[in-house]
Every structure is written in structure tokens, then in C-alpha cells.
Amino acid sequence: PVICPSVIVAITDGDRLLLTKYAPSHSSHRQYALVAGYTEVGETLEQTVHREVMEEVGLKVKNLRYYKSQPWSFSGSLLAGFYCDVDGDPSITLDREELSVAEWFDRDSLPETPNLISLTGEMIECFRQGKEPK
């Protein structure tokens, strides 16, 4: 079977976490999510993190920390979760074709966590509780 590797990225700026929402043309999913994307041929997972973050929100990141993986049968994907820190200016440049919203939330003001069985939901909840990998 074919499996598509992809990344889920929790970008932090101190005690803030960047959350996004997909553009209506890109997905019917309306809850907050993390930056995500598929790995391209010849690309490492770490390179995918840097490329997807730059493409979707225009940020440079550093200090990548692998969290865990999760198979996602709906799309035939293997999701790899990473935490990373913003590198420099945290100003967002939004890719409006893919995202409708990207905004920073303080740890104590994060919106309701999406489905906790998803890697995204688990990673957001870990950040909320201060349990993300340092």
C-alpha cells in the first residue's frame, strides 16, 4: 500500500501557539488546526516542516522537536508531529489559498481543542498543559 508522509507543526513563540483555519476552498474542516502538509519526493520530514511553515504562514522556524506519529487512514497518510520555535519576526504572511486564519494564542487563552484522538488535538492540548517537548 502507498502511504503519504506528512507533517503536523506546532509553532511556538514563548508561551504562544500559532493556530490556523483552512480556507473554505481547501477543506470543509472549520476548527482550529496546526500548520500541516505533505512531504515532497526527495524531501526529509524536517525540510517539509520548514517549507510548509514558510509557504502557509511566511515564518522561519528553529529548534524542531519530533513529538510522535499517527496513521491517518482517511487520506492514506502517516502524520509526523513536530514542535518548533519561531525564528525571528513572528509576523504572519498568510497563504489565503490554503488558510483563512492564522493567529497566535497565549497558552491560557487557546480555543477549545479539536478532536483529542487526532494528533493535532493532542499536540494543542500538550501545549496548553505545558507538556510539549522542550
What is the role of each PLM region?
Residues 22-23, 69-71:
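An acidic- and aromatic-residue-enriched active-site/binding cleft used to recognize and process polar
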